A protein has these predicted regions:
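Residues that mark the junctions of alpha-helical repeat units in TPR/alpha-solenoid scaffolds
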Residues: 21, 57, 93-95
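Structural motif corresponding to the intra-repeat A-B loop/turn of tetratricopeptide repeats
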Residues: 2-3, 35, 71, 107
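Terminal, low-structured helical/coil segments at or just beyond the last alpha-helical repeat
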Residues: 78-124
Length: 124
């Protein structure tokens, strides 16, 4: 599967540049995310949203939020999840709200770990 993704990415990069809408960039961003190419995922999805004519903007926002989450850009992640949470689709709304809570908890956890690490280093 990973090998197939590696082959698909260059093709999607070319297709995204030629496409008249942003949907191909969204798909490319999802491929990047699945390959842990997080900065590339953010860039591609943002380009797709900017280009417009995206089939499911809220789903794209969820994916963008997930990429930001993985990069520990928690504020940007929550922003994207909040936009997605405005969707009329109850499933999208529920998923987005779950991600918001999860992101808030992870943000606290990461800050606490940093505080503990700093404290331990100051004692040693």
């Amino acid at each position: 599967m990973a090998q197939e993704m590696e082959l698909a990415i260059p093709i999607m990069e070319k297709a995204a540049k030629l496409a008249k809408d942003g949907q191909t960039f969204i798909i490319l961003g999802s491929l990047y995310l699945s390959e842990d190419k997080l900065e590339e995922a953010v860039d591609a999805i943002e380009q797709g949203l900017k280009k417009g004519k995206v089939k499911d903007e809220s789903q794209a926002r969820l994916t963008l939020g997930q990429a930001h989450f993985e990069l520990q850009n928690f504020e940007k992640a929550k922003k994207e999840f909040r936009i997605a949470a405005r969707d009329d689709d109850k499933k999208i709304k529920k998923t987005a709200n779950s991600w918001i809570k999860y992101t808030e908890n992870e943000e606290i956890r990461v800050k606490n770990l940093a505080l503990r690490r700093d404290y331990i280093q100051s004692q040693g």
